């Protein structure tokens, strides 16, 4: 067995690792292109089918609901049958759903297609588990940062493709998205090897249920993996709260109108991409994952508090730097530590539970933030989100500096 200092020695991604991460990056980006092609066009499809604004809201939300519900299931499937089959099944489901979406003739079919799209898109946990299987521990945070940066590019490409394709007919965007899923399926089938190495006696080993995994996080929040899940969910709540009211904040505070709001979101997207793709790796090498989580939590809280205090539009771009720095340090590092502390035989389930907590935050945060914005003022959502992140973020300062291996309670 190698000495601890050998385990933590940092070097560049080895060539086989880089190839695997490249495939995961492409998978995440192409998947998000398909999502972004469809998402902004949803209201137009629904209006053509005589949907009410309330019905449109449910159709738009159905993707996230299905995604958070399916994430633990995909993780569990990947623990039992392998990461590669789970990713391929998710891509196939998404492709079929996009095709149905393009030819939907009723609201029920449209809703069904969105639910299946969300379920197919719940395989993010599997990609994270794949990194835990295939990438050296000291390089997982950087790899996860690259993978999480890729969807930002996918959104940009997808938005342009979707609006352009709609000109040629309502079925075209759905067909394009389905074609991309097919391309992604073939690409993954050919280039992504299985990462889940089955050990002797693994088939006979009792497997931890999804219910037990959730129960551990809720009932024993002081355990390390539970702490990491809570930190991840709280960070996602803060980030989602900010993004959900960002346009309203710009309009209320600086009178930014709809035709001028695009560059602000583009700038935010570029910052997110740059921080995860470029800054995260050196930061983790210097601070370690635990240090990055602590600094990321502090930066996220400061960023949330700073938004309501911005004195002028000239200062806003500087304040906007804080959130991307915080989330870039926080999310990939938290996920990387989960892979180190979790039982390898239940890693997919653990990643799925974490994604379910994050998905719940993505659903709850916009509803709560917009309500607080309307009832208590523009600054309230930021302050409340900062307080929640700060309280849960205290758990980050109770994390050990170096993993000693999977916790015994996670292996049952």
Tell what function each PLM region has.
Residues 3-18, 193-230, 412:
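Juxtamembrane intracellular "pre-TM" segments in multi-pass secondary transporters
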Residues 68-105:
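Conserved MFS/SLC helix-loop-helix module at the cytosolic interface between two early adjacent transmembrane helices
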Residues 40-54, 244-260:
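Short amphipathic helix-loop junctions that connect adjacent transmembrane helices
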Residues 164-179, 371-389:
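A membrane-interface helix-boundary motif in multi-pass transporters
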Residues 50, 82, 103-108, 310-311:
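Helix-breaking motifs and short loop linkers at transmembrane-helix boundaries and internal kinks
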Residues 290-334:
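C-terminal transmembrane helical hairpin of 12-TM major facilitator-type secondary transporters
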Residues 113-152:
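Cytoplasmic helix-loop-helix junction between adjacent transmembrane helices
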Residues 70-81, 275-289:
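Helix-to-loop junctions at the C-terminal end of transmembrane segments
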């Amino acid at each position: 067995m190698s000495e601890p200092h050998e385990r933590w020695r940092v070097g560049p991604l080895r060539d086989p690792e880089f190839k695997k991460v490249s495939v995961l990056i492409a998978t995440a980006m192409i998947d998000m292109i398909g999502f972004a092609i469809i998402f902004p066009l949803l209201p137009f499809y629904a209006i053509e089918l005589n949907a009410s604004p309330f019905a449109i809201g449910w159709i738009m939300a159905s993707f996230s609901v299905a995604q958070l519900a399916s994430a633990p299931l995909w993780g569990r499937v990947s623990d039992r049958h392998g990461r590669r089959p789970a990713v391929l099944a998710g891509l196939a489901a998404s492709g079929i759903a996009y095709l149905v979406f393009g030819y939907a003739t009723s609201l029920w079919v449209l809703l069904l297609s969105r639910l299946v799209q969300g379920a197919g898109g719940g395989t993010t946990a599997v990609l994270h588990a794949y990194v835990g299987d295939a990438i050296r521990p000291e390089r997982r945070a950087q790899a996860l940062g690259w993978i999480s940066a890729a969807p930002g590019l996918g959104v940009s490409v997808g938005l342009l493709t979707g609006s352009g394709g709609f000109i040629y007919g309502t079925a075209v965007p759905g067909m394009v998205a389905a074609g991309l899923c097919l391309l992604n399926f073939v690409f993954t089938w050919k280039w992504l090897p299985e990462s889940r190495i089955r050990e002797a006696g693994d088939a006979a080993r009792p497997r931890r249920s999804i219910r037990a995994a959730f129960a551990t996080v809720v009932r024993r929040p002081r355990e390390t993996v539970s702490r990491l899940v809570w930190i991840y969910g709280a960070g996602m709540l803060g980030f989602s709260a900010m993004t959900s009211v960002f346009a309203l904040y710009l309009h209320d505070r600086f009178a930014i109108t709809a035709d001028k709001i695009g560059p602000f979101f583009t700038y935010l997207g570029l910052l997110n991409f740059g921080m995860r793709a470029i800054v995260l790796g050196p930061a983790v090498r210097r601070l370690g994952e635990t240090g990055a989580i602590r600094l990321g939590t502090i930066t996220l809280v400061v960023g949330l508090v700073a938004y309501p205090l911005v004195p002028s539009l000239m200062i806003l771009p500087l304040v906007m730097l804080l959130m991307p720095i915080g989330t870039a340090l926080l999310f990939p590092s938290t996920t990387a530590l989960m892979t180190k502390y979790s039982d390898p035989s239940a890693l997919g389930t653990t990643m799925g539970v974490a994604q379910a907590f994050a998905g719940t935050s993505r659903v709850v945060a916009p509803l709560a933030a917009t309500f607080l914005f309307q009832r208590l003022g523009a600054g309230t959502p930021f302050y409340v989100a900062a307080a929640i992140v700060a309280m849960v973020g205290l758990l980050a300062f109770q994390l050990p500096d170096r993993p000693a291996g999977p916790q015994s309670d996670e292996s049952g």
